[in-house]
Amino acid sequence: MSADSSGKTGYTYADAGVDIDAGNALVKAIGPLVKATMRPGADGEIGGFGGFFDPGAAGYKDPLLVAGNDGVGTKLKLAIDTQRHDTVGIDLVAMCVNDLIVQGAEPLFFLDYFATGKLQNGVAERVIAGIAEGCKLAGCALIGGETAEMPGMYAEGDYDLAGFCVGAVERGEQLTGTKVAPGHVLLGLASSGIHSNGYSLVRRLAADKGWKLDRPALFDNERLLIEHLLEPTRIYVASLLPAVRAGEIDALAHITGGGLLENIPRVLPQGAHAVIDADAWEQPRLMAFLQAQGGIEPGEMARTFNCGIGMVLAVTPDKVEAVTARLNEAGETVHRIGTIEAGEKGCTVRGSTGTWSATADWETRHLG
């Protein structure tokens, strides 16, 4: 409580657990981070009631705006529990901007929402620094956000994140998947790790199996297990955008919750069925570790994790070589993982004996 010149006392917002000064200090601290993300069309100032963006200054003539929002899921809890806050902001941006590029849109600007019970220990600054880094990787401007200090809403040390992104694509150039037809080739871009889906199962395994997160991974003596688990989600925007604008890609699927099995059909028209050959790429060691630890069946892996493929492209056979070369040059690892066949809209993933630890040839399917 505070006292005025007459000696009277009264409640303050700080008495209730909200530190306005801490919030103002945070805005000041992140100012340089925000300015570092600026691009044509953005004004570079934060702290107002909203952020401005001029699509014309970004070079657009007749743009369609594409919007998306997402979070990081329970990967966030793993970061909180291990006090590793520096990369979940990259995950937040990645989950949003990768959802925009699959529609042919260039991410233009991003806003974040950070909520916690109490601002402390520089956690928010570290998280927002990661968000700014993700924005730079994606080429979009961080034009604003909301930091909410809400006593009593969260356990001590906990926080939540949400991201909001808007992109643009010139009218008529958006990716809708309607051009995909039997004969199209499916290319897969390697993921950087688990990305941001499947962490409720990961955390359950960690608890049940007693994993030592701060020790070297069983499959990699040179890196801690927690470092593998918190590897940031790969941002594919910079490498994919030139190919998208060149008209070389007919559909893109971001492999998130639901895995390969359920995400690929989201971008297919009726009459197109994706057939994925799991023998076409090597299962990442981290995925093999998760599968072995949980005794997870191949079909469950295909609908839970990205299994080493973070983005799937549908291209015509005559463009496979050029697209592969372009993406390799951009730093992507590209696998030819399947084809589109005539059939009910959906996806089949199949593998031979030994693939994904299977004891026999296997197949799993999702329709719709």
Curated annotation (Swiss-Prot):
The keyword Disulfide bond does not apply. InterPro entries: PurM-like_C_dom, PurM-like_C_sf, PurM-like_N, PurM-like_N_sf, PurM_cligase. Its main location: cytoplasm. SUPFAM superfamilies: PurM C-terminal domain-like, PurM N-terminal domain-like. Keywords: ATP-binding, Cytoplasm, Ligase, Nucleotide-binding, Purine biosynthesis. GO terms for biological process: 'de novo' IMP biosynthetic process; adenine biosynthetic process. It is found in: Cytoplasm. Pathway: Purine metabolism; IMP biosynthesis via de novo pathway; 5-amino-1-(5-phospho-D-ribosyl)imidazole from N(2)-formyl-N(1)-(5-phospho-D-ribosyl)glycinamide: step 2/2. Its EC number is 6.3.3.1. One of its GO terms (molecular function) is phosphoribosylformylglycinamidine cyclo-ligase activity. The keyword Nucleotide-binding applies. It catalyses: 2-formamido-N(1)-(5-O-phospho-beta-D-ribosyl)acetamidine + ATP = 5-amino-1-(5-phospho-beta-D-ribosyl)imidazole + ADP + phosphate + H(+). One of its GO terms (cellular component) is cytosol. Belongs to the AIR synthase family. PANTHER family: TRIFUNCTIONAL PURINE BIOSYNTHETIC PROTEIN ADENOSINE-3, TRIFUNCTIONAL PURINE BIOSYNTHETIC PROTEIN ADENOSINE-3-RELATED. This is Phosphoribosylformylglycinamidine cyclo-ligase. It comes from Erythrobacter litoralis (strain HTCC2594). The lineage of its organism: Bacteria, Pseudomonadati, Pseudomonadota, Alphaproteobacteria, Sphingomonadales. The gene is purM.
